[in-house]
Amino acid sequence: MKKLILFFIPFICIGQLKFLPKSKGEYVEHTYYSLSYIEDHEQAEWVHYKLNSEMLNGKKVRKRYYIIDKKVSTGSANYFDYTNSGYDRGHLVPAADMKMDSISVIEASYMSNISPQNRNFNGQEWRKLEEHVRFLAKKNEIYVTTGGVLSYGLDSIGTKNKVSVPNLFYKIIYNVKMEKMTAYLMPNKKLESFKNYKVTVDLIEKLTGIDFYHQLEDEMEERLESML
Protein backbone atom coordinates (compact mmCIF):
# COMPACT_ATOMS: atom_id res chain seq x y z
CA MET A 1 0.00 0.00 0.00
CA LYS A 2 2.81 2.43 0.83
CA LYS A 3 4.43 1.77 -2.54
CA LEU A 4 1.17 2.56 -4.33
CA ILE A 5 0.82 5.92 -2.57
CA LEU A 6 4.40 6.91 -3.32
CA PHE A 7 3.83 6.17 -6.99
CA PHE A 8 0.46 7.93 -7.27
CA ILE A 9 1.31 11.31 -5.72
CA PRO A 10 4.30 12.13 -7.97
CA PHE A 11 2.15 11.17 -10.97
CA ILE A 12 -0.33 13.91 -10.07
CA CYS A 13 2.38 16.50 -9.44
CA ILE A 14 4.06 15.92 -12.80
CA GLY A 15 0.82 16.90 -14.56
CA GLN A 16 0.63 20.08 -12.54
CA LEU A 17 4.03 21.27 -13.73
CA LYS A 18 2.91 21.84 -17.35
CA PHE A 19 2.54 25.45 -18.51
CA LEU A 20 3.52 27.12 -15.24
CA PRO A 21 3.78 30.93 -15.50
CA LYS A 22 7.08 32.62 -14.78
CA SER A 23 7.13 33.43 -11.09
CA LYS A 24 8.02 36.74 -9.46
CA GLY A 25 7.24 35.40 -6.00
CA GLU A 26 7.94 32.25 -4.01
CA TYR A 27 7.01 29.16 -5.99
CA VAL A 28 4.92 26.69 -3.97
CA GLU A 29 3.84 23.30 -5.32
CA HIS A 30 0.92 21.39 -3.85
CA THR A 31 -0.48 18.08 -5.04
CA TYR A 32 -3.29 19.51 -7.16
CA TYR A 33 -2.15 23.05 -7.92
CA SER A 34 0.87 25.34 -7.83
CA LEU A 35 1.16 29.01 -6.92
CA SER A 36 3.49 31.99 -6.71
CA TYR A 37 3.24 33.76 -3.36
CA ILE A 38 4.00 37.48 -3.04
CA GLU A 39 4.89 38.29 0.56
CA ASP A 40 4.39 42.05 0.11
CA HIS A 41 0.74 41.40 -0.74
CA GLU A 42 0.22 38.29 1.46
CA GLN A 43 -1.38 36.30 -1.35
CA ALA A 44 -0.63 34.47 -4.56
CA GLU A 45 -0.01 36.41 -7.76
CA TRP A 46 -1.21 33.30 -9.58
CA VAL A 47 -2.49 29.79 -8.95
CA HIS A 48 -2.31 27.21 -11.73
CA TYR A 49 -3.95 23.81 -12.06
CA LYS A 50 -5.31 21.19 -14.41
CA LEU A 51 -9.01 20.29 -14.50
CA ASN A 52 -10.94 17.57 -16.32
CA SER A 53 -14.19 15.60 -16.10
CA GLU A 54 -12.68 12.79 -14.05
CA MET A 55 -11.45 15.23 -11.40
CA LEU A 56 -14.89 16.86 -11.23
CA ASN A 57 -16.51 13.50 -10.45
CA GLY A 58 -15.05 13.57 -6.94
CA LYS A 59 -17.48 13.34 -4.04
CA LYS A 60 -15.50 14.98 -1.26
CA VAL A 61 -17.35 17.90 0.33
CA ARG A 62 -15.72 21.23 1.15
CA LYS A 63 -14.77 21.73 4.79
CA ARG A 64 -15.44 25.29 5.96
CA TYR A 65 -12.10 25.98 7.56
CA TYR A 66 -8.95 27.79 6.51
CA ILE A 67 -5.38 26.66 7.06
CA ILE A 68 -2.09 28.58 7.13
CA ASP A 69 0.07 27.32 4.28
CA LYS A 70 3.27 26.11 5.92
CA LYS A 71 4.94 25.65 2.54
CA VAL A 72 5.14 29.44 2.24
CA SER A 73 8.52 30.14 3.83
CA THR A 74 7.55 33.61 5.09
CA GLY A 75 4.19 32.40 6.36
CA SER A 76 0.89 32.93 4.60
CA ALA A 77 -1.93 35.22 5.70
CA ASN A 78 -4.25 33.78 8.34
CA TYR A 79 -8.00 33.50 8.92
CA PHE A 80 -8.16 36.47 11.29
CA ASP A 81 -6.60 38.87 8.76
CA TYR A 82 -10.00 38.83 7.03
CA THR A 83 -12.23 39.01 10.11
CA ASN A 84 -14.56 42.06 10.10
CA SER A 85 -12.84 43.36 6.96
CA GLY A 86 -16.00 43.45 4.88
CA TYR A 87 -14.40 41.13 2.31
CA ASP A 88 -14.96 37.46 1.56
CA ARG A 89 -12.17 34.93 1.83
CA GLY A 90 -12.25 34.32 -1.91
CA HIS A 91 -10.79 31.10 -3.28
CA LEU A 92 -8.49 31.40 -6.29
CA VAL A 93 -8.70 27.64 -6.89
CA PRO A 94 -12.42 27.07 -6.18
CA ALA A 95 -13.28 24.52 -3.53
CA ALA A 96 -15.78 23.04 -6.00
CA ASP A 97 -12.85 22.16 -8.31
CA MET A 98 -11.08 20.29 -5.51
CA LYS A 99 -13.38 17.41 -4.54
CA MET A 100 -11.13 14.56 -5.67
CA ASP A 101 -9.99 13.38 -2.24
CA SER A 102 -9.21 14.61 1.27
CA ILE A 103 -5.88 16.06 0.11
CA SER A 104 -7.54 18.27 -2.50
CA VAL A 105 -10.14 19.49 0.03
CA ILE A 106 -7.40 20.49 2.47
CA GLU A 107 -5.30 22.18 -0.21
CA ALA A 108 -8.26 24.29 -1.35
CA SER A 109 -8.48 25.59 2.22
CA TYR A 110 -4.93 26.96 2.40
CA MET A 111 -4.81 30.71 3.06
CA SER A 112 -2.29 31.02 0.22
CA ASN A 113 -5.25 30.19 -2.05
CA ILE A 114 -7.34 33.04 -0.64
CA SER A 115 -7.69 36.68 -1.72
CA PRO A 116 -10.02 39.47 -0.47
CA GLN A 117 -13.09 39.63 -2.68
CA ASN A 118 -16.14 41.85 -2.61
CA ARG A 119 -19.08 39.72 -1.45
CA ASN A 120 -21.27 40.68 -4.40
CA PHE A 121 -18.42 39.87 -6.78
CA ASN A 122 -17.42 36.56 -5.19
CA GLY A 123 -20.95 35.24 -4.81
CA GLN A 124 -22.29 36.33 -8.18
CA GLU A 125 -20.45 36.82 -11.47
CA TRP A 126 -17.11 35.39 -10.26
CA ARG A 127 -18.96 32.29 -9.07
CA LYS A 128 -20.71 32.04 -12.45
CA LEU A 129 -17.34 32.22 -14.20
CA GLU A 130 -16.08 29.40 -11.98
CA GLU A 131 -19.14 27.34 -12.94
CA HIS A 132 -18.44 28.08 -16.61
CA VAL A 133 -14.88 26.79 -16.16
CA ARG A 134 -16.22 23.51 -14.77
CA PHE A 135 -18.61 23.25 -17.71
CA LEU A 136 -15.66 23.57 -20.10
CA ALA A 137 -13.59 21.03 -18.14
CA LYS A 138 -16.32 18.41 -18.48
CA LYS A 139 -15.88 18.57 -22.26
CA ASN A 140 -12.09 18.76 -22.52
CA GLU A 141 -9.16 18.86 -20.12
CA ILE A 142 -8.13 22.44 -19.44
CA TYR A 143 -5.48 24.41 -17.56
CA VAL A 144 -6.62 27.29 -15.39
CA THR A 145 -4.57 30.22 -14.08
CA THR A 146 -6.12 32.71 -11.67
CA GLY A 147 -5.04 35.66 -9.54
CA GLY A 148 -5.55 39.24 -8.50
CA VAL A 149 -3.72 42.06 -10.25
CA LEU A 150 -1.21 43.06 -7.58
CA SER A 151 0.49 46.45 -7.47
CA TYR A 152 1.70 48.96 -4.90
CA GLY A 153 -0.84 51.40 -3.51
CA LEU A 154 -3.70 48.93 -3.11
CA ASP A 155 -5.93 49.09 -0.05
CA SER A 156 -5.19 46.41 2.53
CA ILE A 157 -6.88 44.50 5.34
CA GLY A 158 -5.55 42.70 8.39
CA THR A 159 -3.64 43.68 11.50
CA LYS A 160 -0.94 41.02 11.87
CA ASN A 161 -0.51 40.71 8.09
CA LYS A 162 -1.30 43.41 5.56
CA VAL A 163 -3.30 41.69 2.83
CA SER A 164 -3.69 43.72 -0.36
CA VAL A 165 -7.18 44.04 -1.83
CA PRO A 166 -6.95 43.64 -5.63
CA ASN A 167 -9.07 45.96 -7.75
CA LEU A 168 -9.05 43.40 -10.57
CA PHE A 169 -9.05 39.60 -10.81
CA TYR A 170 -8.14 37.54 -13.87
CA LYS A 171 -8.73 33.99 -15.03
CA ILE A 172 -7.05 32.31 -18.01
CA ILE A 173 -8.37 29.05 -19.46
CA TYR A 174 -6.31 26.97 -21.89
CA ASN A 175 -7.92 24.13 -23.83
CA VAL A 176 -4.96 22.20 -25.21
CA LYS A 177 -6.97 19.89 -27.46
CA MET A 178 -8.92 22.72 -29.09
CA GLU A 179 -5.89 25.06 -29.13
CA LYS A 180 -8.00 27.77 -27.56
CA MET A 181 -7.15 30.29 -24.85
CA THR A 182 -9.80 32.41 -23.12
CA ALA A 183 -9.18 35.11 -20.52
CA TYR A 184 -11.31 37.27 -18.25
CA LEU A 185 -10.39 40.42 -16.33
CA MET A 186 -13.02 41.50 -13.81
CA PRO A 187 -13.29 44.41 -11.34
CA ASN A 188 -13.63 43.36 -7.70
CA LYS A 189 -17.20 44.64 -7.29
CA LYS A 190 -20.80 43.84 -8.21
CA LEU A 191 -20.94 43.31 -11.97
CA GLU A 192 -23.10 42.55 -14.96
CA SER A 193 -22.48 39.28 -16.81
CA PHE A 194 -18.93 37.88 -16.61
CA LYS A 195 -19.15 37.41 -20.38
CA ASN A 196 -18.69 41.16 -20.78
CA TYR A 197 -15.17 40.96 -19.31
CA LYS A 198 -13.42 38.75 -21.84
CA VAL A 199 -9.95 40.07 -22.73
CA THR A 200 -6.72 38.86 -24.32
CA VAL A 201 -4.00 37.15 -22.33
CA ASP A 202 -1.68 39.80 -23.74
CA LEU A 203 -3.56 42.47 -21.77
CA ILE A 204 -3.32 40.48 -18.52
CA GLU A 205 0.42 40.02 -19.08
CA LYS A 206 0.79 43.76 -19.57
CA LEU A 207 -1.07 44.55 -16.33
CA THR A 208 0.60 41.89 -14.17
CA GLY A 209 4.08 41.62 -15.66
CA ILE A 210 3.66 37.83 -15.65
CA ASP A 211 4.67 35.73 -18.66
CA PHE A 212 2.00 33.05 -19.18
CA TYR A 213 2.43 29.98 -21.41
CA HIS A 214 5.99 30.89 -22.31
CA GLN A 215 6.65 27.17 -22.93
CA LEU A 216 4.65 27.29 -26.16
CA GLU A 217 6.34 27.93 -29.48
CA ASP A 218 6.47 31.66 -30.18
CA GLU A 219 4.03 31.57 -33.09
CA MET A 220 1.45 29.59 -31.13
CA GLU A 221 1.89 31.69 -27.99
CA GLU A 222 1.38 34.91 -29.93
CA ARG A 223 -1.70 33.54 -31.69
CA LEU A 224 -3.38 32.12 -28.58
CA GLU A 225 -2.58 35.03 -26.29
CA SER A 226 -4.06 37.54 -28.74
CA MET A 227 -7.38 35.64 -28.92
CA LEU A 228 -10.50 37.45 -27.76
Task: Show which residues each predicted segment covers.
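Viral RNA-dependent RNA polymerase
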Residues: 15-22, 66
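Bacterial Sec-dependent N-terminal signal peptides
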Residues: 1-18
